[in-house]
């Protein structure tokens, strides 16, 4: 274990997430009981520590990715909003998501026949399986999984306008925030690649990296960027205590303009609902309802 005082993101026993670009004038902090892992992979700084409230915490490049305590609020919403917005998803693509949480949730759908997961950093997968095993909960051993260790952007470029057998019903983008190499995942070209990789009636969902308390103009611009490519684009959100302002926005798109993305297209069985902590049909729809002032900006 590393002494707390030696890590650049930790001072006086407190982890500090500070970003003057995304949330100037404020910071998110939590105490560090012990550091479980700290090193730089080929792609990013990785920090894993214990907190008495949130349990094990995964931090990439100084940004909290997930904690044992509240991870389900993000994993379930980014997964099941997209999965239930499709009437019969059989082929699913996950871009990023190395902690395994989204994979765990996708694997709960018995209708799914093939899961392709593209993660550039194998270290995140290995460390998450070691220190955060409940996130994947064995899903990396699912026989439906085809795990590819490569860049998600290039993977989509290689699909291009290929035959329908290589395309997907649902694509879930669980990428890092739009800084450095990940910035490409929030631009118009990326949405074009997503559309090319979708089957008819396909659904795409991605985390926006922001929420309406922090940067309304950014969310407005991001949604409009997606709308240039997809005829059906909506914004919704989920509540996660360890994300800045306790909230994270999601962009949901479809190449079918007639699909009401805010309404589940399949009924959830009692058995399926019993496996979930956060998502339900009511919260699916309510997640698209925004406060008046935010709705005017984001959806204008």
UniProtKB/Swiss-Prot annotation:
- Keyword tags: Phosphoprotein, Polyamine biosynthesis, Transferase
Q: Which residues form the active site?
A: 174
Q: Quick check: keyword Chloroplast in the entry?
A: no
Q: Which GO terms describe its molecular function?
A: spermidine synthase activity; spermine synthase activity
Chain positions recorded as S-adenosyl 3-(methylsulfanyl)propylamine binding sites: 44, 99, 119, 151-152
The record's annotation in Gene3D superfamilies points to: Spermidine synthase, tetramerisation domain (2.30.140.10), Vaccinia Virus protein VP39 (3.40.50.150)
Task: Write the protein's name.
Answer: Spermine synthase SPE4
Query: Would the keyword Oxidoreductase turn up in this protein's UniProt record?
Result: no
- Location of Phosphoserine modifications: 5
The entry's spermidine-binding residues are 177
Question: Which family does the similarity line name?
Answer: Belongs to the spermidine/spermine synthase family.
Reaction(s) catalysed by this chain's protein: S-adenosyl 3-(methylsulfanyl)propylamine + spermidine = spermine + S-methyl-5'-thioadenosine + H(+)
HAMAP family for the chain: Spermidine_synth
Domain (PABS): residue spans on this chain: 12-255
Could you state one GO cellular component term attached to this entry? Answer: cytoplasm
Signal peptide positions (record): none
* Its EC number(s): 2.5.1.22
Tell me the route in metabolism or biology where this protein functions. Answer: Amine and polyamine biosynthesis; spermine biosynthesis; spermine from spermidine: step 1/1
Additional information: Present with 3870 molecules/cell in log phase SD medium.
Quick one: a GO biological-process term for this protein? pantothenate biosynthetic process
